[in-house]
Amino acid sequence: MTSKLEQLKQFTTVVADTGDLDAIARLKPVDATTNPSLLLKAASLPGYADLLKQAVSTGKGDPGLACDHFAVAVGQEILKVIPGRISTEVDARLSFDTGATLLRAERLIGLYEQAGIGRERVLIKIASTWEGIRAAEQLEKSGVQTNLTLLFSFAQAQACADAGVFLISPFVGRIYDWYKKTEGRDFVGSEDPGVQSVSRIYDYYKANGYDTVVMGASFRNLGQIEALAGCDRLTISPELLQKLAEDEGELSRKLAPGGAGEARQTLDESAFRWALNEDAMATEKLAEGIRLFARDQEKLEALLAAKA
């Protein structure tokens, strides 16, 4: 019997949500995703000590630039062991500034290209704020493909699709966390609000012919992953990937094109902001996610500054 990981790979592109090179090499995902929190964790790994030193040197006393150099250096190493793409994130503190997000994204792509890595192997991660989505729209038109993250609401998914972004990362586990805490009960399988969110977005995209890739993210357990088998892509932590690799039970496809999706609806800025405001979970989780990524960005900058 093949493992659930191998079965999942038959109908979903598996992505590793980590900066751990050893785990990536062992689990053989197609793509990999990073974020400020994962980069901070990677900075403590012995294998990245030299990259930290190089980032400090090339950062020229600018902690933000040093962080970008480190992020790109980690991305370079990961790209040596995966066939697909690396997702590298823009500083979360720029989440409400379209122009600054564009400049930072262009800097990241420039650093990759200076290292001899084509932009076709990189996705720029941006928070799914109105300003972030507008930046992504411009980047896509200029040939830079994007991954819109911290996506918790249907309105965010609608706006991303209309902007023509390459890929979205709707979060499962953080939605689950909010409802579990708010309602004081557990959720399993298709009853999980996080699973329901991704399923609804997937069906909407397929029913309306959107090319944007749906990549479920932020998983708390195997049940959530299994309930989304068939999603375009799933980005999964090494711990859960290992559990899938060790489980030889049967895994069936749950999502497939052809389901009943809602009619297309285009949101202007006012409608987007109102819909997000009406969704207490998404409003709270988006704000929290930006704060957490910003905090870890600051910690990474402090770590690099201390080594200068």
UniProtKB/Swiss-Prot annotation:
UniProt-recorded Gene Ontology molecular function terms: transaldolase activity
Major place of residence: cytoplasm
Keyword Transferase carried by entry: yes
Cell compartments where the protein resides: Cytoplasm
GO biological process: carbohydrate metabolic process; pentose-phosphate shunt
Methyltransferase among keywords: no
EC number: 2.2.1.2
Similarity comment: family membership: Belongs to the transaldolase family. Type 1 subfamily.
Protein name: Transaldolase
Gene: tal
